[in-house]
Amino acid sequence: MENSRTPTNKTKITLNRTPTLKERRWNTLKVNTSNVRCSTPIFGNFRSPNLSPIENMGTKGKSPVSPMRFATFKKVPTKVHPKQQQQQQHQHCHRTQLKPPPFVLPKPQEEIIEPEREIKSCSSPDTCSDDSNMETSLALESRRRSIKASNHSYVVNHAANVEQILMHMGLENYVTNFEEAHIDLVELASLERADLVKIGLNTDEDCNRIMDVLHTL
């Protein structure tokens, strides 16, 4: 203990420490305000990380990021000939007077098809008369069959097929003739004697028997 003592030589010890505000040299960085656009202002000595170009908002009258002066982009007025000016005014008036076309509802498909059928059928007077006669005869025939079928609506609605009606009325011997002719319930209710001859029932006895049964339905 007697031999130990405090050293008398003074030594300077340097330690790492946080730099003060005065030593922050990176805060004095300048940015070209004409090429950088940013809206973050500067408050005191604190600068935003993105190096905002807005500086001294209170002292400067205009913002450095304000748009460029319009005077540099003003178009030089050119002299217009009176005739050319009148023509431009006429074109402008003509465009303003244009109105959209009136909206027309499309016609139904049936109204379009019917005139086409009439034109095709009446291309010549002979064919027109023949077609009209055929159409009237078909219309009359379909109307006659529908009227007769309506009178037998109960049978038509409650029977499964033609065979069932013939078996029920005792006409099972004629089932084959009706099936080969592909006669359905509506046609069965509106059959006439001439129709029976067409399906192969030529004898008067068969025709009379079938017609009597159909009339009693």
Curated annotation (Swiss-Prot):
Effect of S124A: Does not affect interaction with polo
Keywords, sorted A to Z: Cell cycle, Chromosome, DNA-binding, Meiosis, Nucleus, Phosphoprotein, Ubl conjugation
Record GO terms (molecular function): DNA binding
Chief localisation class: nucleus
Subcellular localization, as worded in the UniProt entry: Nucleus; Chromosome
Free-text function comment from the UniProt entry: Polo kinase inhibitor required to maintain G2 arrest in the meiotic cell cycle in females. Holds heterochromatically paired homologs together from the end of pachytene until metaphase I. Haploinsufficient locus for homologous achiasmate segregation and may be required for the maintenance of heterochromatic pairings.
Protein name: Protein matrimony
Species this chain originates from: Drosophila melanogaster
Taxonomic lineage from the root: Eukaryota, Metazoa, Ecdysozoa, Arthropoda, Hexapoda
